[in-house]
Regions:
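Catalytic grooves of carbohydrate-active enzymes
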Residues: 223-236, 480-510, 529, 610-613, ...
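Helical hinge/lid and interdomain linker segments adjacent to catalytic or ligand-binding clefts
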Residues: 29-43, 47-50, 289-370
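C-terminal domain-boundary segment and adjacent tail
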Residues: 256-273, 310-317, 476-493, 523, ...
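A glycine-centered loop/beta-turn motif at secondary-structure junctions
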Residues: 275-278, 306, 400, 409-495
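Non-catalytic C-terminal accessory domains or segments of carbohydrate-active enzymes
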Residues: 263-265, 362, 755, 761-921
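A glycine-rich, often tryptophan-bearing local segment used as a flexible ligand/cofactor-contacting loop or short
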Residues: 340-412
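Catalytic domains of cell-wall/extracellular-matrix polysaccharide-remodeling enzymes
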Residues: 133-155, 161, 172-183, 608-685, ...
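Metal-dependent polysaccharide deacetylase catalytic core of the NodB/CE4 family, i.e.
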Residues: 76-78, 91-103, 356, 363-373, ...
């Protein structure tokens, strides 16, 4: 365990019907880019501290164990040059490391001050001590060995006295336990069932005699010292099932298992297994001006995110993630819009990941040269371009999904695959072609059988159609397991509803009867915001509203209208920036210019040079200081213009404690009923993240405000088509201030509001939704035997279950309030940031739906207690409530209606504290 490794953890399916036998789990990760959120579901997470600058602030309340070699040191360690020669006894020939003389008090003091103390400051609350038996290589006599053991024990006790809250894990060190007075949590050892013989470069079974000796040591440690025991075994990276079987055997001895490869550079397996959700999305760019406009982003995000995956995006000509991705990533998707984009280094890297068993999906064009040296690794065989149009000889049901296969077929990549399960098989003359298939390594769909225009040769928004069902293909190609899927569309069984307004047109003058000569903002305030108490996020553009902006003579009036809007209890504040950049990348690249290659870059504020911090944080501070009262603060930035902010703008928002939203174009309608117009929930940009608006505004539905001006009412079509057959999106009423400038446009907005009021929805603020999207990216899902364990930030409160998974058993569950089987899906309601349950269901009472958030939930022997807080009159339903009474403040609540064992309740209040359901059974 001395090497720097890229291990992480977890994917053991264990015995399918068995409950986990261990209450604790361990994980070891010594690689770069430490996934703290995933490690946090483990009781004993161990990391290599040199791979990070410390434990991130958000995780400093949790215990992470830093790897520390107490017996020897590599010359590459930063502190090595400060060691005195007399502190070293000799060398370890296997590793080239130097062995400490721990009988030296000066060395012990040095290690405490120079090694342990900095780690404690970095947030580590535990230490994993390795190389505790290295002294045996140089200490040959019993007296010498006892001297070194006593020195080791003295060092550990010294660390424990210096940091009394620290906890420790030993790698072996059995003989030290009688000598230490430190709080040891666990003892680990390698190779209980299978080991790696480095000299022979092979895996080998552990002899029964060796296993029994180690089990005896483990048993003695548990009985005498009440510590956990951990066994670390080794298997080849591609042998996941073998790893699961070994882990299952280890757990049968009451020993915590960890099974990985000898290099420890992949996610291992334990009885508690995290299901990886990250997927590497590799794009080759496009003809568009920005990578964010490539097909991989426009079309590729939704099928991945809807199935619970979290894309990490890289261009094919950039550096790929280091190490073995097996278990760390759910798979790799390579989406290319033209041929011959990959180079030799990328192909070699892709082959390496394929050999390690990482599922790979190739979309658009082959990710390796079909006649190159790596084609054979993927089973590709080049075929001559057909002389006559090939005929279809076999077709998967998922092909021809939104657009029938053309009668005259052209092949972008004339290939056959010898290892494939064909999804589309063609024949021309003597040759067979398979342009779409799943394979043992993943799968592929090549153009024109992935996405195709309804008008051949024409490109344009709304013309493209999926030729293959993207959900089905991604699921099968990436070999995704059936797992609970974090869902941002729903809470407590109801589809979310929120509204937000971009401030464009705030100073414009309205044409609406009764408001001629008054601003659009005034019309919106009086006719919409005061009439509909729906949670709404309202923004302003500082450069238009402030006295130092473009309209100083109107500023007093505009600021007062904004104050009146923000004073409404159902309105939260957002900034729509300072100068409303129209093209963010160009505006930032040319800060002093007003026009760029795409047109005007921003509003013409005199003397201003574009600065992303001023745009975002500065405008939010203006709102806080001039337009808000009481405890209200600006919550968000709503991106302006092309809604493609730069990473620097996103960083400014995050560092300014502002959420962000806007971008992408979900505009599916009955005239364009295609999933190519259902976009993702957001996009990562380096270390930053842009949250997309779920729906689009009236500008799109009115043909960029050229008419028909009543066109926004068609957003109701979008709402319906993103609800059935799948709930892809919440209901998001998104508009500009100028929608209130024309009678037809205003009436369309009122129509949309009235429709939303008539639906059984769950109102929230846009900021609530943005937090759910961010939580989606880091929520951790683990399986333990046949039970599930979830951990997140507590913002996202819904999991969607595939048909293959049973509903939860509620007795004995943690963090589960109930569930709802609805048309678009089966939704599990979380009541906290952590949840744990086994499959059920059981005929016990449960929360079936609510239009408010759970602020407290506690299951009791004969019912449960709960509190709800929402934004409108409460509506909720309780299942299996026969023979139960719902009490509040000493009285009982009467259901307004009953459907079998489902009882529906209403209250004119927006929140109720300490509701108590008591049942006689």
């Amino acid at each position: 365990m001395r090497t720097f490794v890229t291990i992480l953890f977890v994917l053991l399916w264990g015995s399918a019907g068995a409950q986990s036998r261990l209450d604790q789990a361990a994980a070891f990760y010594y690689g770069p880019d430490i996934p703290w959120h995933m490690l946090s579901v483990y009781d004993f997470p161990v990391v290599e501290p040199d791979q990070a600058s410390g434990v991130p602030d958000r995780y400093r309340s949790e215990r992470f164990y830093a790897y520390v070699s107490l017996g020897e040191v590599l010359a590459s360690r930063p502190f090595f040059k400060s060691l005195k020669p007399e502190w070293l006894l000799g060398k370890n020939p296997d590793w080239g490391s130097h062995i400490f003389d721990l009988s030296s008090p000066d060395l012990r003091d040095f290690l405490v001050e120079q090694v342990v103390a900095p780690l404690w400051k970095q947030g580590y609350q535990g230490f994993f001590f390795d190389t505790l038996d290295s002294y045996q290589l140089v200490a040959k006599t019993p007296e010498q060995r006892q001297h070194q053991r006593e020195g080791l024990a003295a060092l550990i006790n010294q660390i424990a006295q210096r940091y009394p809250e620290a906890r420790f894990i030993f790698n072996r060190g059995f003989e030290l336990m009688p000598l230490v007075e430190a709080p040891v949590d666990a003892i680990a050892a390698e190779s209980l069932y299978q080991r790696w013989e480095a000299g022979k470069q092979r895996y080998a079974a552990v002899p029964e005699e060796d296993r029994q000796w180690l089990l005896g040591q483990f048993s003695a440690m548990r009985e005498q010292y009440q510590v956990a025991t951990i066994a670390i075994d080794y298997t080849p990276p591609g042998q996941r099932q073998q790893a699961r079987e070994i882990a299952d055997k280890i757990a049968g001895h009451d020993v915590i298992p960890w099974v990985t490869n000898p290099e420890l550079d992949m996610f291992g397996l334990g009885e508690r297994e995290v299901l990886p959700r990250k997927v590497l999305l590799v794009h080759g760019g496009s003809d568009e001006r920005l990578w964010e406009l490539s097909d991989s982003i426009r079309y590729g995000l939704m099928p991945l995110q809807f199935q619970g995956l979290v894309p990490e995006i890289r261009a094919i000509n950039t550096t790929m993630p280091a190490g073995n991705l097996q278990g760390r990533y759910a798979g790799i998707v390579v989406w290319l819009e033209q041929e011959e984009l990959s180079d030799a280094d990328f192909e070699a890297w892709l082959v390496e990941q394929k050999e390690a068993g990482v599922p790979i999906a190739m979309l658009g064009y082959p990710a390796v040269d079909p006649v190159g040296p790596n084609a054979q690794a993927f089973g590709f065989e080049s075929r001559p371009t057909p002389l006559s149009p090939p005929a279809i000889t076999g077709q998967h049901p998922a092909m021809g999904f939104e657009l029938a296969l053309p009668k005259l077929i052209e092949l972008s990549s004339p290939l056959h695959n010898v290892s494939a399960q064909p999804w589309l098989e063609l024949r021309s003359g003597e040759h067979t072609y398979t342009p779409a298939a799943t394979t043992p390594w993943g799968g592929y769909v090549f153009q024109p059988f992935m996405i195709r225009s309804v008008l051949p040769g024409e490109k344009g928004e709304g013309l493209d159609r999926w030729v293959v069902n993207p959900l089905t293909f991604i699921r099968e190609a990436l070999q995704l397991p059936a797992m609970p899927i974090p869902d941002v569309t729903t809470e407590n069984g109801r589809r979310l509803l929120f509204a937000h307004m971009d401030a464009d047109g705030f100073p414009s003058l309205a044409e609406v009867k009764g408001y001629q000569g008054q601003t659009d903002a005034r019309v919106l305030l009086e006719e919409v915001l005061k009439r509909f108490e729906l949670p709404t996020t309202i923004s302003v553009i500082e450069g238009e509203v402030a006295p130092h902006g473009l309209y100083p003579k109107m500023s007093a009036e505009l600021e007062q209208i904004a104050r009146d809007m923000f004073a409404l209890p159902h309105v939260e504040a957002a900034t729509h920036t300072y100068s409303h950049p129209f093209f963010w990348y160009d505006a930032q690249r040319m800060p002093g210019q007003l026009y760029g290659p795409e047109g005007q870059l921003r509003l013409p504020i005199p003397g201003y040079r574009m600065d992303p911090v001023r745009e975002v944080v500065g405008s939010a501070e203006y709102i806080n200081e001039n337009l808000l009262s009481g405890d209200k603060r600006t919550e968000m930035v709503l991106w302006s213009g092309d809604t493609i902010p730069t990473p620097e703008a996103l960083a400014a928002a995050r560092q300014g404690n502002l959420l962000n939203m806007n971008g992408s174009d979900t505009i599916i309608t009955e005239s364009a009923p295609t999933w190519t117009l259902v976009k993702g929930i957001g996009v990562p940009k380096g270390d930053e993240y842009q949250v997309y608006a779920p729906n689009q505004n009236e500008n799109i539905y009115t043909r960029e405000w050229t008419g028909p001006f009543y066109g926004f009412e068609r957003v109701i079509e979008t709402f319906k088509l993103t609800e059935t057959p799948h709930r892809f999106k919440p209901v998001n009423i998104y508009y500009h201030t100028y929608i209130a400038s024309k009678t037809a446009a205003l009436e369309s907005l009122l129509t949309v509001y009235r429709w939303a009021q008539s639906q059984p929805l769950h109102p929230v603020f846009a900021s609530d939704y943005a937090r759910k999207v961010l939580d989606f990216n880091t929520i951790v899902i683990a399986r333990e035997g046949n039970s599930w364990r979830i951990k997140g930030e507590g913002q996202l409160r819904t999991l969607r279950l595939p048909d293959a998974l049973a509903l939860p058993s509620l007795p004995g569950s943690k963090g589960i309030a109930g569930y709802r089987e609805d048309g678009p899906g089966r939704y599990v309601h979380l009541s906290a940031n952590e949840a744990h349950w086994q499959p059920g269901p059981d005929p016990v009472p449960y929360l079936q739906q609510a239009n408010a958030r759970l602020t407290m939930f506690a299951r009791e022997e004969k019912g449960f207690r709960f509190s709800l807080a929402g934004h409108t009159d409460l509506e909720f339903a309780i299942g299996n409530a026969g023979g139960c009474t719902l009490n509040h403040n000493g009285g009982s609540l009467t259901p307004v209606r009953r459907e079998g064992t489902l009882y529906h309740y209403r209250s004119a209040k927006h929140g109720l504290e300490e509701l108590r359901l008591h049942c006689s059974h």
